[in-house]
C-alpha cells in the first residue's frame, strides 16, 4: 500500500525521478521481487533451501538502500533531482527495505520450524555469522544487484 501511495504522490505532484534514479530503483525492485518469491516458496513449500537464500539477499537489499540514499543526495547536490522527489524516494526505499525485512522474518520462521527452534533472532544471527554458504550467496547477490558505476564528476 505504501509503495502505491508513493506512486500516486509522484503522479499527483507531477514529480519524476531522474533516469539514474529510475535505473537504481529497477535494480532494487528486481531484488525485492526475488526475495518475495524466495520467501513465498519457502513458506508455502516449507522449503529450507529457499529460506536460506533470503537472508543474504536481505542484507544486499539493506546495502542497496543505503547506497541509493547516498546517490540521491549527490544527485540533489548536482541539481539532477528535487528535494520534493527526494522525500518520496526516501519513503519508497524504506518501504521496499521493510518488505525485505518481512521476507527475512518469514524465512527465519521456516528455518526455525524445520529445526524445532523458536528463537528467530538467534537463527538469523547464526546464519549471518557462521555459514560459508551465506557469504557465497551474499557475494553472488551483490554482483547480481550491483548499481551502475557513477559517472566521474
Question: What function would you assign to each model-found segment?
Answer:
Residues 1-153:
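Cytosolic, long alpha-helical scaffolding segments
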Amino acid at each position: 500500500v505504501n509503495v502505491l501511495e508513493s506512486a500516486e504522490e509522484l503522479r499527483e505532484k507531477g514529480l519524476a525521478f531522474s533516469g539514474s534514479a529510475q535505473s537504481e530503483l529497477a535494480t532494487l525492485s528486481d531484488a525485492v521481487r526475488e526475495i518475495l518469491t524466495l520467501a513465498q516458496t519457502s513458506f508455502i513449500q516449507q522449503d529450507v533451501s529457499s529460506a536460506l537464500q533470503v537472508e543474504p539477499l536481505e542484507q544486499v537489499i539493506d546495502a542497496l538502500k543505503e547506497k541509493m540514499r547516498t546517490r540521491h543526495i549527490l544527485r540533489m547536490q548536482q541539481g539532477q533531482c528535487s528535494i520534493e522527489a527526494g522525500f518520496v524516494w526516501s519513503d519508497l526505499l524504506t518501504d521496499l527495505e521493510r518488505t525485505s525485512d518481512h521476507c527475512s522474518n518469514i524465512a527465519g520462521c521456516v528455518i526455525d520450524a524445520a529445526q524445532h527452534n523458536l528463537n528467530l533472532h538467534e537463527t538469523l544471527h547464526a546464519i549471518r555469522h557462521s555459514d560459508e554458504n551465506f557469504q557465497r550467496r551474499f557475494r553472488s547477490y551483490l554482483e547480481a544487484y550491483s548499481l551502475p558505476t557513477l559517472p566521474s564528476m
